[in-house]
Amino acid sequence: MPKNAVVILRYGPYSAAGLPVEHHTFRLQGLQAVLAIDGHEVILEKIEDWNVVELMVNEEVIFHCNIKDLEFGGDGKLDPLCEKARIAVLNAY
C-alpha cells in the first residue's frame, strides 16, 4: 500500500477501569501513531460492536483485534498488535 493511504479505524465501546461502557480512544493512540508515522491518514469511526477494533483499507477489513489487547496510551512502537496492524496496512492492495 502506498504512503498516504486512507485507513478507517473502526472501534467499539468497552469498559475501562470501572468507567461505563463507552467509545474510549485511549487504547487507540499507539495504533494511530504507528500508522501516522508511515504517512497514512487515519479516520476514526465508532461502531456498536463491543471490544472491537477493525482497520479498513479500500472498503475491506484488513485487520481486527480486541481493543482491550492494545496497550494503553503510548506511541505503539512496543505494542506487537500495532506492528501487526501496520504490516496489514502495508500489505493491503
Swiss-Prot record:
Pfam families recorded: UPF0728
UniProt name for this protein: UPF0728 protein C10orf53
Cleaved signal peptide residues: none
Organism: Homo sapiens
Family (UniProt): Belongs to the UPF0728 family.
Upper classification of the organism: Eukaryota, Metazoa, Chordata, Craniata, Vertebrata
